[in-house]
Amino acid sequence: MIDLTPQPGDLDPIETAPVEELRALQLERLQWSVRHAYDNVAHYRRAFDEAGVGPDDIGSLADLARLPFTSKATLRDNYPFGMFAVPREDVVRLHASSGTTGKPTVVGYTRDDLDMWADVVARSIRAAGGRRGMVLHNAYGYGLFTGGLGAHAGAERLGCTVVPVSGGMTQRQVQLILDFEPDVIMVTPSYMLSIVDELEAQGVDPRSTSLKVGIFGAEPWTNDMRREMEERTDMHAVDIYGLSEVIGPGVASECVETKDGLHVWEDHFYPEVIDPVTGEVLPDGEEGELVFTTLTKQAMPVIRYRTRDLTRLLPGTARTMRRMEKITGRTDDMIILRGVNLVPTQIEEIVLGIPTLSPHFQCHLDRSGNLDTLTVRVERRDATTDEEAAAAQAELGRRIKASIGVSVGVDVVDVASIERSVGKMRRIVDHRAAR
């Protein structure tokens, strides 16, 4: 793979500033953001007053822990514009979640918010190996989902030539990759696998394309998936993180030179990790639920937003800013099976350790009597024989039991048996409510 290590002068000065300078900037911006939220959002004023804490009580970064949390339910309870801190006419764009489990969560942006967002996405693409003048194939979905437009604006801000393909039409994705010869692709990791499969189906070696960097986000993926992707495509596979409630993509990104955790852009987003049960702030290095406070957002500041993503904070490496470990799962994706907690990424690591199995899998939850059951459905690879598939099925069952301590069902199925997604992959299928 090509060396894309940044050169001196490529980075924003704050990325390598002394930690004391960064912390001073964070405190100044935190105090502004808390005051802005308190003065302009009725929910925050009421919540802070009930907690007995006000903007004047925030004298240090540690004081942030005195403030109450914000959740997705908070945003839905104030649907559609109740969390906005500026007049609606100052909001130049709206995005929203799909709302498949209730009211959508609506987020708004001022012109300055959009400029900041473009800056942090540009910083993320550059960290991942993107450079001015490169062609970037954007296969994130456009529309109310923040991925497509967020990636697009950041790539243009960096100076890339953007191909705004959006998601879907996999054969067309492949044709445009072959015709336009992009250097970078931004897409969900599960859909990248579909693109790679389609390249191979057309007789094209995925290692022979022009792609140098894949920036994958919107769903958790493991280092085993990275190895799979890099071996099959000969491009750097780099993680990007974001969520619409905070800004969209560009909250954090891995850097291509280390690929060992995502640098949080702490000059705009202050991270905490908490115990998901007690809400206690955990020290750096301990795994828990990720919480973010925006430091510069105007239209919709969020204070201590509970992401439900599980990770831990680590010291900076190539940059001053702390890293977050790759997301291991979500508190709401956690499967509790006979008292044992597991997340789909644990299954992914085991699946990818068996060469005759593909990365395409789903976890099916069901109930037999009063007992919850789990069946892992996973596709065999193209060249896998029936005998190898049977052996892989037995081996996967053994490895899962050895790893998590309980037995699960395993069903190795034919290629293309599991639904493909152009967005976030549906890893858990819960049949229990139908019983």
Please annotate each region the language model reported:
Residues 1-96, 101-119, 123-127, 131, ...:
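Nucleotide 5′-phosphate-binding alpha/beta core
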Residues 37, 97-100, 136, 185, ...:
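Conserved S/T- and glycine-rich ATP-binding loop of Class I adenylate-forming
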Residues 111-124, 135-194:
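AMP-binding/adenylate-forming
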Residues 135, 202-221:
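Conserved helix-loop-beta element of the AMP-binding
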Residues 158, 180, 210, 232-236, ...:
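Short, structured coil segments at secondary-structure junctions
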Residues 185, 291, 295-404, 423:
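AMP-binding/adenylate-forming catalytic core of the ANL superfamily
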Residues 192-210, 227-231:
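Adenylate-forming
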Residues 221-316:
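Conserved AMP-binding/adenylate-forming
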